[in-house]
Amino acid sequence: MTPAQGSGDHRTAEGFRNPHDPTTRTLRDVWRWRRTTTPAPWPPWIDDPPQPAPPRLAAGRIAVTFIGHASFLVQVGGRCVLFDPVWSMRASPLSFAGPKRVRAPGQRLEDLPGCDLLLVSHNHYDHMDLPTLRAVRRRWAPPAVTGLGNARHLAKAGLRGARELDWWQHAEVAGLRVTYVPAQHFSARTPWDRNRSLWGGFVLESPDGGTVYFAGDSGWCPYFEQIGRRFPRIDLALIPIGAYAPRFFMRTQHMDPEEAVMAHRALGARRSIGMHFGTFAGLTDEPIEEPEARLTAARPTRACRRRPSPPCPSARRWRSRRLFEQLLLGEGAHRGPHGGGAHRVVADMRAAGDAGIG
């Protein structure tokens, strides 16, 4: 399907729009952001070295490794799926300017147990990194799925034949059912192609009953309730919590931690993990540690009554049946200094079962 073949109230003559957000950002808004606010200082580098490689798991379990920012390796249905992989030092078209990484990816790309499917939510540089995509293609040559209008970018990385989906469309790829779901955001890789390609998230469903939701980028909007109604058994949701400051500029495009908890509740997910924070300096104005602190304060009350999971000291505890990520939206958690250990995320749970979930 090409962009011209798409339909729905998110379509325009030139591309796409947000049906629930009529506002548009102009150069004047960018000027106001850059000239009237002062970004919080971030540390130049955090010593958070890559962790040992996770094993490849058989079907019947869901496992997730947080690479950093919005990059994840998810194992579901016996398949290894990469979401929005970015291993580059900058989330930028330029190697010498733009948002810069302050901590290493949580895993070396070459140490991953595989990649059977590649999912790219939208075309922003902190989600679609062509050097990383080229490396993924050279090593595994996986099939790729993305939103309408984005396959041309993936082709530049050698990933030809990527499957493009409109919102709510699905495809059977690599033995999994992949549904592209709505998000409230925008797209652009240059000043001239804003909203010419589609943005969104993904729901993965495996034959063994496991269901994983990846939000991509989104502001708070009615889509979370809609996704929860269409997919009432989401085992694991990956939800952004950072890049929300200043609010006058980011509010409709990026959720803050309190809104992320609202999204967790609206989705009805059994577990949710916070993402999109603490990795690239220059992407946002908030302090590096603030998303975690605000998330800790905002977690659902009912979850805090549960016996909290211990923090994950290292990815060596991979086989644990508990969810050790300290950024759980739905359970008590631990927060280290400057997000310490935030890239050492380990989750291993039974698909469509209660072990390690409750």
Give residue spans per PLM region.
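Metallo-beta-lactamase
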Residues: 1-111, 146-216, 235-242, 294-316, 320-322, ...
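Active-site metal-binding loops of divalent metal-dependent hydrolases
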Residues: 85-87, 123, 183-185, 216-218, ...
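Active-site metal-binding motif and surrounding structural segment of the metallo-beta-lactamase
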Residues: 93-146, 161, 232-238
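Cap/insert and terminal regions of metallo-dependent hydrolase folds
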Residues: 2-19, 109, 117, 143-152, ...
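Catalytic core of the metallo-beta-lactamase
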Residues: 72-77, 172-234, 251, 255-259
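Acidic/histidine-rich helix-loop elements
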Residues: 87-104, 186-194, 245-254
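Divalent metal-coordination and catalytic microenvironments
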Residues: 74, 84, 122, 129, ...
